[in-house]
Amino acid sequence: MDLIAEPNLKELINSTTHKWIFVGGKGGVGKTTSSCSISIQMALAQPKKQFLLISTDPAHNLSDAFGEKFGKDARKVTGMDNLSCMEIDPSAALKDMNDMSVAQNDKNDGFSDLLQGGGLAELTGSIPGIDEALSFMEVMKHIKRQEEGEGEKYDTVIFDTAPTGHTLRFLQLPQTLSQLLQKFGEIAGRFGPMLNSLTGGGQNMDIMGKVDELKANVEKIREQFTNPDMTTFVCVCISEFLSLYETERLIQELMSYEMDVNSIIVNQLLFADDDAEHNCRRCQARWNMQKKYLDQIGELYDDFHVVKMPLCAGEIRGLNNLKKFSQFLNKEYDPVADNKIIYELEEQK
């Protein structure tokens, strides 16, 4: 007899093996709220462990969701001892790369002059997919710090990802980089001496060593991302045709990358049949539409954890509101017993 997946994320929230959790889907479906909710519930369920929530979306929303400012360095969420947040800023990361390159290069060569003028940042800033590449570099830096015992040690990292297209490019990077580095290694092996002479003459750049080290790091991430005990992807959608269609496309892509995906959060549900006091014709009509697509989700993903989350009367912002909302990831929302909670959110300034 097949086991039926529970309609909650209790198993993931209490997981002791997952290092990487990605949360993603179509734009505007509640990805940030969902990633914040997962992070909060995991931190509450496992108080002795440390969790890090990273935004890889250029339109950062973590600061807005929690009502406090986060930046490129991890910082604890006020009121949570074991949950930190950070927002990767591609433009700041490019400036850091440029400044680092200036410091490492000979001040008398022409390449250094180019960098002094912000040449690297200007050159790379317009490359398609640079945001995803920089996000991936942050992952690699994080793994390296963990292995070397530097900084805060995090047991699980949760990613609040960009809309689907950006996320897929991000997840393709380990495979793409691995192939690229293989080719680059072959070229560097043949033309290494010539490349050294072109980069300033006096410096003996260990190109092959750098490439091999980068390849090893990329391969390590590939192995972790495709290990279902270490990495999983939580899809977020709303109960409408376009969102369902994009979720199916995302799941098929994730499976082609051999990445584990077995959870879907369906946001903004009205549950109008059980809310007679606040029901209206428009609410009932939309709920009837939502039920149609919920049935399709149930048929398509009968072996997934499908979590049905309510549409709240107010904004889900601030730690207290996020705690109230996130409890329904752990315990299914009951439209009758839990009805009052969605009308009792604190108003945020």
Curated annotation (Swiss-Prot):
Cystine pairs: none
InterPro entries named in the record: Anion-transp_ATPase-like_dom (IPR025723), ATPase_ArsA/GET3 (IPR016300), ATPase_ArsA/GET3_euk (IPR027542), P-loop_NTPase (IPR027417)
Binding site for ATP: 26-33, 240, 267
One Pfam family named in its UniProt record: ArsA_ATPase
EC identifiers of the protein: 3.6.-.-
UniProt-annotated location(s): Cytoplasm; Endoplasmic reticulum; Golgi apparatus
GO molecular-function terms, A-Z: ATP binding; ATP hydrolysis activity; metal ion binding
Keyword Endoplasmic reticulum: yes
Annotated Gene Ontology cellular component terms: GET complex; Golgi apparatus
SUBUNIT field: Homodimer. Component of the Golgi to ER traffic (GET) complex, which is composed of GET1, GET2 and GET3. Within the complex, GET1 and GET2 form a heterotetramer which is stabilized by phosphatidylinositol binding and which binds to the GET3 homodimer. Interacts with the chloride channel protein GEF1.
Family as reported in the entry's similarity comment: Belongs to the arsA ATPase family.
Name of the protein in its database record: ATPase GET3
Organism: Lachancea thermotolerans (strain ATCC 56472 / CBS 6340 / NRRL Y-8284)
Gene that encodes the chain: GET3
